[in-house]
Amino acid sequence: MELTTRTLPAQKKIALVAHDHCKSMLMKWVERHKALLANHTLYATGTTGNLVQRATGLNVNAMLSGPMGGDQQVGAMIAEGKIDVLIFFWDPLNAVPHDPDVKALLRLATVWNIPVATNLSTADFIIQSPTFSDTLDVLIPDYPRYLAERLK
């Protein structure tokens, strides 16, 4: 597949997602980085977003809850270039009924080459990166070219 460049803006659009057993960990992480996150636009699946907003006072654009379609809403935003970073604390020790949605969300984040953190260490690496609040060019699929090839 041919690639093109997308520039992630200095003010990132960050999606926050956490499975039930990981929500408190995400809350503590957001609280720890609240001052920096306040400079960015936050999105989240429903329950997570409402909990983060209530706990921190940060403005969070909440989608539906993950099992009700929120993971897919976030995935669609990634595919549309409307999410720049995904912080997704998922629970590897407990199965969730919407596991196919989880896999699809992670697949889309990989396809569209956005930074993804699935644990505390990676989330800290991303947010503490010197480039976190700068613009950043990333390679993404050249969808118009992909579509043109498929329609030949």
UniProtKB/Swiss-Prot annotation:
Q: Which residues form the MGS-like domain?
A: 6-152
- InterPro entries, A to Z: Methylgl_synth, Methylglyoxal_synth_AS, MGS-like_dom, MGS-like_dom_sf
Pfam families, alphabetically? MGS
Keyword Lyase among record annotations:
yes
Instruction: Provide the GO biological process annotations.
Output: methylglyoxal biosynthetic process
Q: Which domain of life is it from?
A: Bacteria
Q: Active-site positions, per UniProt?
A: D71
The record's GO molecular-function terms, alphabetically, read:
methylglyoxal synthase activity
A GO CC term assigned to this protein in UniProt? cytosol
Please give the SUPFAM superfamilies that the UniProt record associates with this protein. Answer: Methylglyoxal synthase-like (SSF52335)
* Enzyme Commission no: 4.2.3.3
Q: Which UniProt keywords apply?
A: Lyase
Q: Which positions does UniProt annotate for substrate binding? A: H19, K23, T45, G46, T47, T48, S65, G66, H98
EC main group: lyase
Q: Which CDD domains match?
A: MGS
| Function statement | Catalyzes the formation of methylglyoxal from dihydroxyacetone phosphate.
Family label: Belongs to the methylglyoxal synthase family.
Protein's UniProt name: Methylglyoxal synthase
